[in-house]
């Protein structure tokens, strides 16, 4: 489910436009929501990590190598090389917070379930329950794999060395 993009366990950041539409970064795309309804998706121009923000109703997307400036529909207006990755690093640092019209929005995690909360306490987005269940399932699987690996290492170390002793006749 994760490989197909149907379940998302982490986000690449978020931003809002002047109409308070939510832009939520996922794997290789930015989904645009209006009041919890998905409107459309914008291509992130990479299948790897990226960072983005919205300034003056334009999306700035940094792939650490290239910066794309797009309109709110995702049409590329301009692009340039980010040779020192400074914009990428700055956007990554600020990916869990966004300010618009004097209000601050923050990405919070409640037991691993992401949600975006306005400074007045209003939740404007929460990770879907299916995605959260998949995320918990992955964490439990990883924990079981670690326990299994430790068990196997311990059990192989405890095996006695069996050596053949010949009796002299």
Provide a role label for each language-model segment.
Residues 1-169:
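Eukaryotic scaffold repeat domains enriched in small/polar residues
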């Amino acid at each position: 489910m994760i490989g197909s993009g149907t379940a998302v366990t982490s986000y690449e950041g978020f931003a809002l436009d002047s109409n308070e539409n939510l832009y939520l970064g996922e794997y290789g795309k930015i989904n645009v929501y209006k009041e919890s309804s998905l409107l459309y998706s914008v291509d992130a121009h990479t299948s790897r990590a990226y960072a983005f923000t919205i300034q003056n109703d334009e999306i700035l997307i940094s792939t650490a190598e290239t910066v794309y400036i797009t309109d709110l529909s995702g049409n590329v207006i301009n692009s340039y090389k980010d040779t020192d990755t400074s914009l990428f690093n700055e956007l990554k640092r600020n990916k869990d917070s966004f300010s618009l019209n004097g209000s601050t929005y923050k990405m919070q995690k409640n037991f691993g379930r992401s949600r975006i909360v306005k400074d007045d306490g209003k939740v404007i987005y929460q990770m879907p329950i299916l995605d959260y269940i998949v995320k918990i399932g992955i964490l439990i699987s990883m924990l079981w794999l670690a326990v299994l690996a430790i068990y196997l290492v311990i059990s192989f170390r405890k095996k006695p060395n069996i050596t053949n002793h010949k009796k002299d006749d």
